[in-house]
Amino acid sequence: MTEQKVDWEPVIGLETHVQLGTNSKIFTSASTSFGDDPNTHIDPIVCGLPGTLPVLNKKVLEFAVKASMALNLKIAKHCKFDRKQYFYPDLPKNYQISQFDEPIAEEGWIEVEVAEKGKETYLKKIGIERLHMEEDAGKLVHAGSDRLSGSKYSLVDYNRAGVALAEIVSKPDLRSGREASEYASEIRRIVRYLGVSDGNMQEGSLRCDVNISVRRGPNAPFGTKVEIKNMNSFSAIQKACEYEIKRQISTYESGGIVHQETRLWDETKQLTKSMRSKEGSSDYRYFPDPDLGPIEVSVELQEKWRSELPELPSSKRHRYAEELGLSVYDARVLTDDYQMARYFEIVVLEGADPKLASNWITGDIAAHINANKKSFENLLLTPKQLAEMLLLISQGKISGKIAKEILPELLEKGGSPKELVEERGLGMISDPKVLGAIVDQLLSDYPNEVESYRGGKNKLQGFFVGQLMKKTSGKADPKLGNQILTKKLKGE
């Protein structure tokens, strides 16, 4: 394939399906529990059997409105549900209840930080066209293949059918695979901070479809749009976009035609494959659902839900950098995980230095959590205990080396760092008389090195510092020890 040329501009929009974290489904009391035996969470309403009537789950409405507010969308005065008609085995009713022309919210935006390779990080405002509520479909399992083509037979699990979704449709404001990936990442951060979804891509709680075309320059008409599905990571979103951009440019430049279609991303082969021609809205024959009346969210209810919104990740990043003096990178890493950010803030409230807390949390503690598949929520080392350890370091009572020695036990069992240090006799030696006596002994042990130092080999200072730390098992106060060494080496 030919490389992307300067005169071609990609145009990308994302449809992000967020599974809302309610205990029951959108129109029925059936459970939303993930990973249970197939077809154990279905009922007559999910299957659309005659005589059943759907009833909107109020928690779904609350989560959808809160997500809309966080995305700066305007909440509609009233909205309605529609039936989207299509035949596919994973849809037990042969129609999906969605929102067509009157969604819950429209016209919003978010800002994302984009770090393109070889470029400076920049902020970009991405428009959001709408957010609408709908029900999820079931899941097909193909025997002998990961798709229908090539499989011996298919099984259908309706446990997911009827689970509440919020579909977030961006405007075609994205111009690269990296921007698309960063936008999707920020959407996930936001819904996790709100507590409306776990955003788990591996479990299908957050799924993205990419709509992509290319055109000759920013003022040219949009090209033919292609939809890409089957991306289960942010890296896959970026790679799929980059591949499809090159494919479309190559097609146009060789005189071919880009067809409006749905394509699948093949993670193994790192390319997109044609799946089917893309349907238009008329193919779905939308009409208002006669079993569900229009919805109106009162101003009072909107204000109540708005007052419950937490501080969002973009605001936290800015505050950490401006008020706590953290680097942009550290602020981003901390706020990427809501539980990590919450843990960090409690540690700082307990009196720990923000930069020191950030280093330990994003370093050793995050590494422990990742290696042991834990989370900050169930960490045995409480924020208060970590703050206690960091204060011991700041006050010069233990060294960073000693802190690293006791950290594994604290992570496994919890407990007071101060008591552990006292119990093991690991406290810092900061008494000038005690350190002075140790330095005197050290200098008498290495007379030749002392003579060389006094002869002008000042680099031997590092050797003596190392020996001092070795002799004290790392417990000597580094600053005070260095001062005493310097004076005694100079014969003062």
UniProtKB/Swiss-Prot annotation:
Coiled coil: none annotated. Pfam families: GatB_N (PF02934), GatB_Yqey (PF02637). InterPro entries: Asn/Gln-tRNA_amidoTrfase_suB/E, Asn/Gln-tRNA_Trfase_suB/E_cat, Asn/Gln_amidotransferase, Asn/Gln_tRNA_amidoTrase-B-like, GatB, GatB_C_1, GatB_Yqey_C_2, Gln-tRNA_amidoTrfase_suB_CS. Keywords: ATP-binding, Ligase, Nucleotide-binding, Protein biosynthesis. Its EC number is 6.3.5.-. Gene3D superfamilies: 1.10.10.410, GatB domain, N-terminal subdomain. One of its GO terms (biological process) is glutaminyl-tRNAGln biosynthesis via transamidation. The keyword S-adenosyl-L-methionine does not apply. The keyword Transmembrane does not apply. GO terms for molecular function: asparaginyl-tRNA synthase (glutamine-hydrolyzing) activity; ATP binding; glutaminyl-tRNA synthase (glutamine-hydrolyzing) activity. It comes from the Bacteria. It catalyses: L-glutamyl-tRNA(Gln) + L-glutamine + ATP + H2O = L-glutaminyl-tRNA(Gln) + L-glutamate + ADP + phosphate + H(+); L-aspartyl-tRNA(Asn) + L-glutamine + ATP + H2O = L-asparaginyl-tRNA(Asn) + L-glutamate + ADP + phosphate + 2 H(+). SUPFAM superfamilies: GatB/YqeY motif, Glutamine synthetase/guanido kinase. HAMAP family: GatB. Allows the formation of correctly charged Asn-tRNA(Asn) or Gln-tRNA(Gln) through the transamidation of misacylated Asp-tRNA(Asn) or Glu-tRNA(Gln) in organisms which lack either or both of asparaginyl-tRNA or glutaminyl-tRNA synthetases. The reaction takes place in the presence of glutamine and ATP through an activated phospho-Asp-tRNA(Asn) or phospho-Glu-tRNA(Gln). Belongs to the GatB/GatE family. GatB subfamily. Heterotrimer of A, B and C subunits. This is Aspartyl/glutamyl-tRNA(Asn/Gln) amidotransferase subunit B. The lineage of its organism: Bacteria, Bacillati, Cyanobacteriota, Cyanophyceae, Synechococcales. The gene is gatB.
